A protein has these predicted regions:
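His/Asp/Glu-rich mid-to-C-terminal helical/loop segments that flank catalytic regions of hydrolases
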Residues: 211-242
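Mid-sequence, gly/pro-rich, charge-dense loop/helix-turn segments that line enzyme active sites
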Residues: 88-178
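A C-terminal functional module that forms or caps the active site or interfaces directly
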Residues: 163-216
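Alpha-helix C-terminal capping segments
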Residues: 69-73, 91-92, 191-200
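N-terminal short beta-loop-beta anion/metal-coordinating cradle
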Residues: 2-68, 74
């Protein structure tokens, strides 16, 4: 019997973040859809790898539950979270990308009980570390991408919360408590599920807005193109994963 291929899970919160993968699997004739509850899991091959691509929906709980099902039911052995984010660091601009060093919940606050900012009670952690080999694969893929000709990729912390960060005071507070590179609404939920299941993960995000009062102009204009730029790097990244 041949050796069973490892499956790679790819999660995006919105259709626009995963469409490129489904279209590629449709083109190569490997796409198989499986409905589980309100989730649709798209199985197939990309870059010679067995993948399962799924839209989680927006928010931490949706993302964590999606990751858990991907691990248990579809036997994903690695998970990539792809999508868009708002910049927190001043040196990050629209269309730049962030590959996660770790992920935190910026809205986790049990400091009244002596825990540190973002620290999860009774878990002895405030951040979930991404897999180094997957980080390196993302960096290699970005270096070969069209995006690298105009934009940059940095390593950094991803901050997650059930809030769309859209004003400067909110942004400053998040920067103060956990010093992330960018902010979004799913990554730490996925990272949390991977941590509990001992599954390697990485989050790759393309900057769509500045997480401030300018979001009405920047986000709507950049949502689609930033999502597709990120997905293109993830697609290339698969070539560098075992």
């Amino acid at each position: 019997m041949g050796k069973k291929m490892k499956k790679i899970g790819i999660i995006g919160a919105m259709d626009v973040e995963i469409n490129i993968f489904c279209e590629e699997m449709k083109k190569n004739g490997t796409l198989k859809k499986t409905e589980c509850g309100n989730l649709v899991f798209n199985e197939g091959k990309l870059c010679g790898k067995d993948v399962v691509v799924v839209k989680s929906g927006i928010g931490k709980v949706n993302a964590a539950l999606c990751a858990q099902r991907l691990i248990l039911q579809f036997e994903a052995e690695k998970i990539i979270n792809t999508g868009i984010a708002g910049s927190i660091q001043q040196n990050l601009h629209i269309h730049d990308m962030v590959v996660s060093t770790d992920a935190v919940y910026h809205d986790m606050d049990a400091t009244a009980f002596g825990y540190g900012p973002t620290e999860i009670p009774q878990m002895h952690t405030s951040a979930f570390d991404a897999d180094e080999k997957m980080i390196e694969a993302a960096e290699k893929a970005f270096a070969l991408s069209e995006s690298a000709k105009k934009y940059k990729l940095i390593r950094g912390r991803i901050a997650t919360g059930d809030q769309f960060v859209s004003y400067s005071e909110q942004k400053s507070h998040i920067e103060e408590i956990c010093s992330p590179a960018c902010v979004e609404m799913e990554g730490a939920g996925i990272a949390h599920a991977c941590f509990l299941n001992k599954i390697p993960f990485v989050i790759l995000r393309c900057i769509s807005d500045n997480a401030d009062d300018s979001y009405e102009v920047t986000y709507s204009f950049n949502e689609k193109i930033a999502s597709e730029e990120c997905a293109a790097v993830v697609l290339k990244m698969l070539e560098f994963l075992d």
